[in-house]
């Protein structure tokens, strides 16, 4: 979406907000508006617009994923996991990476390995990304033995990987 279109969406939102009204946006418009906030690193209205989007389109997976990311950002990992579990979509890279990040942050290496093994069994298309994304999280959490084990598992599967 063009910058002018995003500006119009934001202006429409702010005008309605100023008048005490609730504007209507389709799910794609909400997603575009949220994306523009992220790109500009301006989160002044992010929570409000996301809440409005989820109110208008509660079953929209993209908006639910943004809510999960917000939970993770706010370190509310249990809420993020509960929402991830409630989303009926499978084989979704964003959801799987968020789930694994939550397991790392909750110090649940057992669950992380269990879920990773499930992804391996399902021959997940983005399995290499799972290892590349998750290994640094384990290191950041100072779970050094677990990080080493996870990296070794990844190297066993992807011996040519230079990131691991």
Predicted feature residues:
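Short coil turns that delineate tetratricopeptide repeat
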Residues: 58, 90-92, 124-125, 159
């Amino acid at each position: 979406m063009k910058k002018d279109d995003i500006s119009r969406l934001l202006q429409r939102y702010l005008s309605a907000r100023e008048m005490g009204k609730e504007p209507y946006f389709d799910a794609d418009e909400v997603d575009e508006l949220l994306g523009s906030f992220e790109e500009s690193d301006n989160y002044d209205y992010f929570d409000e617009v996301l809440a409005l989007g989820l109110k208008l389109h509660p079953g929209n997976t993209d908006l639910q994923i943004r809510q999960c990311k917000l939970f993770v950002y706010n370190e509310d990992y249990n809420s993020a996991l509960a929402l991830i579990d409630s989303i009926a979509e499978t084989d979704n890279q964003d959801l799987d990476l968020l789930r694994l990040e939550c397991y790392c942050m909750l110090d649940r290496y057992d669950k992380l390995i269990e879920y990773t093994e499930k992804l391996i069994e399902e021959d997940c298309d983005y399995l290499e990304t799972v290892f590349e994304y998750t290994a640094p999280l384990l290191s950041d959490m100072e779970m050094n033995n677990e990080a080493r084990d996870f990296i070794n598992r990844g190297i066993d599967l992807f011996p040519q990987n230079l990131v691991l």
